[in-house]
């Protein structure tokens, strides 16, 4: 189906298939391709693609051939990034078939058997006979491919037969029929009467349905376990039995019988739930369960219950944790008349605040006493009147403030006043009065913004301009209808569906790809936002400020801003050949100075240096210095995504002598040695919901402990009780969601100094920044609701950014934020030079003809759409097509005249030839278009005799893989002299550093200038010794303004605006391109 679609788009199906027919052999295990294809000049495109598939682990390399297994083939057919390449192998069309299943015996019988009795065509449902090799069947001398669902069904039936020969018995029959039934339902197969009424369910995951009630001011929560295809009467059997069984038989209506098989890991979680009387928890148990079910339900819960499922269950049950504050209401005599308790729900969706009024001190006293019980027990949460209170961030000072408020009110009622509360002489010599806090401002800071546009990973070219007419990304009704029509078509074997937005016919596979990308776009757009609420301003002690002039000097208590001007203390363990750059020395000194002022003057900081400036080395230098200077102090904790933890350990070994720096990896297999088995945890702790604990002394002699965010969440009772000197959260975007369990666990950890480390502190909204500072310096930015009203709304206002409010926020966080860009540290780096001459490439004649015909087609569609009030539709597909035409017209039309008249390709080959014969420098070519990648690879091979490596997001990252991403890059960098590597602009993530290349060619442009600069930074970073030359080849025309010319202008104007870390990245509007489309 995809082959027909793509051949239609290119218009060259017969020509392609003529050269490629019979280039594979059908085997039982898959399709095989001879390695000799590489030597056939007529088949270079196929050979190049097969090499790509081998690099991405689709193909198995054998001694004389490549093997594409059937499972890999089906994955490939669903991979939209390879969709345009499928005609290269000419896979047969899928033959829609419906299987009819028959059985013999019952599940309890030793001779129980299930087989496919008949195949019938769809939609005619006529019986059909055929021969088959693997997933390829032959009918009437024509080859077809089984659908993925029918192939899975066929394998499941064969697997049951094989298992019965090895381990016969009822359990084998049950598990085998469960697997077959699941595949049969997906394939819309037909069952005989016995199979229709016999269900087998083996749940591998659970969801929890929660119901909350308040009984005598105490929250009571009922827990109901649920799994997919759960029989209606299963929960009754679960509750009725005294223990959890390995299997259940649940009778149903009309003679149906369901077999439920419980795997060990699911049984362990169900045992925990079953041990709860009536499946109800109350009081402290309810708090522990709601806040973190993983510590309550045991070590297997994390693999059985998905975090998002639990968070959704809490939301559905309207169960929220609440930040709280006490607000005194003063009368005309400045005395307390009453106190209001304000509860702010922590939720990704804004919820109304809840308030309680205390009219007398005794009422407030009850609240403080109940709060004190939770605080004394060091519990991360408490409760009041059935509402859950978040205490992970509740400080000792806040506790004292609550007590002081009660004491003041009691004394006022008794007619007593503090005699010295307003006496300034009672305070330090820097205090000059009492009043509202005055925010610090800095006049040299400037406003900037960044913009983003269409997502690069959505390919709109699968549909024509007419097909996309009427499509609106925000129309979720159309999205739901599209998914429903896809499901219906799959069930009955239809090959096409009707588009909900204009009734055009869509190939099913292309529609599924489009739906998947549309869903990704919605998920990105719908990330959770913070709540917004008021917060009453409070009085503070005014102090002398040293911003505009030095108003107060006292050497033993310097301003936090002075920390930037200190000299670093370089750790003795730093290896002799390692020399810190100037900006790294400044960063280490800044961290050291802030730490020395903690905890009295600061609780933590945000290290937000630009990518490639060595944040890891700075933090490691800081940590090693601390270990050397304070050897008796508690250890330090580094929390990072699991993919980065090995890099932390590797860089520690590379840069430092680590003999005196013991490190513990608290994740993966190593955690088992220091973790209590569940049965060893005392019953009184388990009764309170504490079922995950580390053994006493688990940290050993370690001075640095590495762990994951997930371990931090699951082991919070141990990690939060351990005093830490320094806690580092790397890639701190992981704690940007205030409502996530991981964020709560991070905030619960007691550390003298916390460091949030991220190059992108604001990704989607300023709430990201609030959450980071809620970790590093709680209360600095106020309550989340206050922050939303005071900063997020005016700064992110669509009608215009409030620059005064933006600068106020910048000044507020400046003392605890360090952000340097490469421009600011250029003295320590080679130059980055943009080559302007390549921006004057002339659009070729045939290229211009193809360009104008595409625009004319779109303009004609616009004229037809205006009467339907749909003007502007289809623009996304057109813009993508214009991007392809400008880059290399042969990607749109492979006729020789288009390949021979490609100005950008001709320019590329010319500049590469100059570099090869002069400087012999290495070159990176960036483009995310896979078809274009192969065209460039082939052209370079034809010109220079070697095939440059291509690396995309799917290239393996496993270190043991022969074609791993890092190994390919290392090989490229190790080869002497001239070389070329082709990278995807949007796939250059962690670990892709190519400092040996110093020429960066953006053959196609990214819609986002920040991503484009990040791609360039793969070469322009610490370790680069040569000037880096950056090329943006652009085709122009004397009569029309081209797409590339307009895009280059937009990106250039936005590049400088994209550097402010406080600015989120809104999307560009398609209106920016309307002028060139209407004028072409």
Swiss-Prot record:
Mutant phenotype after disruption: When this gene is missing the Zorya system does not confer resistance to SECphi27 in E.coli.
Protein's UniProt name: Zorya protein ZorD
Organism per entry: Escherichia coli O139:H28 (strain E24377A / ETEC)
GO molecular function, a single term: helicase activity
SUPFAM superfamilies recorded: P-loop containing nucleoside triphosphate hydrolases (SSF52540)
Keywords, comma-separated and alphabetical: Antiviral defense, ATP-binding, Helicase, Hydrolase, Nucleotide-binding
UniProt entry tagged with the keyword Calcium: no
Domain called Helicase ATP-binding: residue spans: 596-779
Pfam families on file: Helicase_C, SNF2-rel_dom
Helicase C-terminal domain segment(s): 904-1069
GO biological process, one term: defense response to virus
Function: Component of antiviral defense system Zorya type I, composed of ZorA, ZorB, ZorC and ZorD. Expression of Zorya type I in E.coli (strain MG1655) confers 10,000-fold resistance to phage SECphi27, 100-fold resistance to lambda, and 10-fold resistance to T7. While most T7 infected Zorya-containing cells undergo abortive infection, a minority produce viable phage progeny. These eventually accumulate to a high multiplicity of infection, leading to culture collapse by 2 hours after initial infection. ZorA and ZorB probably assemble in the cell inner membrane and exert their effect there.
Keyword Nucleotide-binding: yes
